[in-house]
């Protein structure tokens, strides 16, 4: 992740739930609730510290870092990579990943049909997408509403 980037799930504020609950598995219960219930944006350093992303570097270095990381696998037999990947994925399956993903997808559909979500989405033709997203994010001063370059 670029060290000046932000990540989060703003739709949890009004129009959805994540269809994959990897946040719980990666961040633990406390941080997953903190960020998914609020929809707050997470800066790169925090995302790295809490385990949401594995690496942070300047944007100009990302391609080189990805290439270098990928090259670490070139001498490992594909069957060895596949077996280890299946074992890791199975551990997550045993913790309920598939069920959580199915429920997340269902709840995402439900969340988009609540009265509040319908009112929010229904205002897009009149106000425009950028305006309704700004109204969602302005109170939190994040995502597109985040002050930049010394703005306050």
Question: Residue spans of the language-model regions?
Answer:
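C-terminal long alpha-helix characteristic of the crotonase
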Residues: 1-5, 12, 53-102
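Short aromatic/basic micro-patch
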Residues: 26, 41, 56
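C-terminal alpha-helix plus adjacent terminal tail
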Residues: 43-44, 75-152
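Conserved catalytic core of Hanks-type protein kinase domains
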Residues: 26, 38, 75
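Recognition helix of helix-turn-helix/homeodomain-like DNA-binding domains
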Residues: 50
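CoA-thioester-processing core
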Residues: 1-35, 65
